[in-house]
């Protein structure tokens, strides 16, 4: 349940301790915010209002629709671990860099702040699959590190603009200009 109940009825803790039945009876909505030392301390709620809140919470905890979506749309299938081939090999769809790829890339002089995204890896694999070249696993990782570094720095470190977004004019007039 939410810990905040918005109410316009506010009372000091001393007045509540003096006669809590009268205070709650006068409240609108059955709730009173109780302040101590000019700061909110807690809320006092009538039993009827508490029952309403619990019923509302129970109602909201159940979905309003009986449509159940298949779990296969939300769960990625577990991929079997693919062993790294020995020697040189052509790029294949299930290729993955090592778990400590960012550390290795830093040793090669390529500082990657963020890990390689699935999109970057997919683009790299698609390109090199079409090329058909063969390299050792470590060479593929070096190529991936350089490829990611170049693609990320091509836009000055800024994220690429969405070509589908519609630009909006700036209506702000800088100081010193007339509008």
From Swiss-Prot:
The keyword Repressor does not apply. GO terms for biological process: DNA replication, synthesis of primer. Residues 151-168 have a biased composition (Polar residues). Residues 151-179 are annotated as: Disordered. InterPro entries: DnaT, DnaT_DNA_bind. The keyword DNA-binding applies. It holds the Pfam family DnaT. Disulfide bonds: none annotated. GO terms for cellular component: primosome complex. Keywords: DNA replication, DNA-binding, Primosome. Homooligomerizes. Interacts with PriB. Component of the replication restart primosome. Primosome assembly occurs via a 'hand-off' mechanism. PriA binds to replication forks, subsequently PriB then DnaT bind; DnaT then displaces ssDNA to generate the helicase loading substrate. Involved in the restart of stalled replication forks, which reloads the replicative helicase on sites other than the origin of replication. Can function in multiple replication restart pathways. Displaces ssDNA from a PriB-ssDNA complex. Probably forms a spiral filament on ssDNA. Belongs to the DnaT family. This is Replication restart protein DnaT. The gene is dnaT.
């Amino acid at each position: 349940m939410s810990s905040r109940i918005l109410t316009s009825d506010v009372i000091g803790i001393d007045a509540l301790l003096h006669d809590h039945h009268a205070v709650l009876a006068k409240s609108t909505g059955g709730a009173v915010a109780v302040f101590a030392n000019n700061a909110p301390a807690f809320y006092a709620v009538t039993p009827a209002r508490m029952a309403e809140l619990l019923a509302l919470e129970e109602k909201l905890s159940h979905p309003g629709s009986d449509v159940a979506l298949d779990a296969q749309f939300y769960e990625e299938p577990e991929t079997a671990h693919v062993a790294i081939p020995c020697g040189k090999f052509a790029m294949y769809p299930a290729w993955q860099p090592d778990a400590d790829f960012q550390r290795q890339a830093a040793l090669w002089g390529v500082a990657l702040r963020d890990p390689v995204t699935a999109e970057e890896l997919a683009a790299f694999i698609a390109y090199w699959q079409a090329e058909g070249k063969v390299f050792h696993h470590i060479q593929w990782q070096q190529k991936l590190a350089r490829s990611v570094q170049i693609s990320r720095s091509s836009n000055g470190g800024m994220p690429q603009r969405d070509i589908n977004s519609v630009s909006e004019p700036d209506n702000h007039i800088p100081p010193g200009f007339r509008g």
